[in-house]
Amino acid sequence: MTKYLKFIVFTSFMIGFIETSYADFGFIQDKDGYVNVRENPSLSSKVTTKLNNNEIVSCVMDEETNNFCLVNASNGVTGFVYRNRINNFSGYTSIKLSQYSREKAVYNDKNIIVEVYAKKAISDPKLYKTFKDEYKYFNDKKFFGTDGSLPDNNFLQLDKIIVKEKDNRMEISRIELEQYFFPKDGVDGGRNELADFKIYYLNNNIYILNTFNNGGAAAYNIVLNVKNGKVVANKAWKVEI
C-alpha cells in the first residue's frame, strides 16, 4: 500500500512538472567536469548517475522552482540536474526561421544560412526490418518517430540539410538523415516541426537541434554538430518522461 501511494504521489508530481514547464537544449558545464543526476528535483535527492561536461541534453525546466530541470541525454540518462550546471548555448549565436513550407525551412542571419529539407515518408515495407514485432530499422538504420509502426501518408522524413557560410557550402546528405520521421502537419494544421529547429553557432562550430513528435509517445531528440565543415556528431534518442 505504501509503495502504491508513493507511485501515485510521484506520478501526480511528474504530471504537474510537465504541465508547468518548458523544454530547451543545452550542454553540461561544471567546474568539476561532470554533474550529478538526481532521482528527484532536490539537492538532498539520491544521485543516480553523472553526466560529463559537454554532453548535450534536452532540459524540461520547472517554472515554479526554476532550480532544476528534467534532462534527457543522448547516452540514455534521464533525471534531474541543477539548472546552473547546464549552459543553454550562452556565447553562441542563435539563428531564426526566415522561410517555411511543409518540406523546406530556412534559417539564417548575416553570416550563415541553414536550409532543412524533408520529403514524403517512404512506406515500402521491404525497406524496413522488425524487432520484437515492431518496425525498428529503415535501410538498416534504427529509425525514429513512428513508435514502432510503418510511417503512413501523414509522415515526412528528413532529406538533407545545406549549410552555407560565406564562400563555403556543405551538405548533410539523405543517407545521414533519412531515419528521422515526423508528422507532416503541425498542431491544428499549423506549421510542422521543420519550423522548430534550434540552431546555434560559434566560429566554425554549429549545432542543429530539434525535438520531433514533441509531446507524443514517439518523441525524440536530434542533435547534429557540424565543425569546420564536417559532421562530427549525429545523435538521436527517445525522449523519456
What does each of the following model-derived ranges do?
Residues 41-46:
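Short alpha-helix capping/helix-loop boundary micro-motifs
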Residues 178-222, 227:
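Acidic, glycine-rich flexible loop segments
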Residues 17-23:
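Sec/Tat signal peptide C-region and signal peptidase I cleavage site
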Residues 1-9:
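Bacterial N-terminal signal peptides that target proteins for export
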Residues 24-27, 50-84:
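SH3/SH3-like beta-barrel superfamily modules
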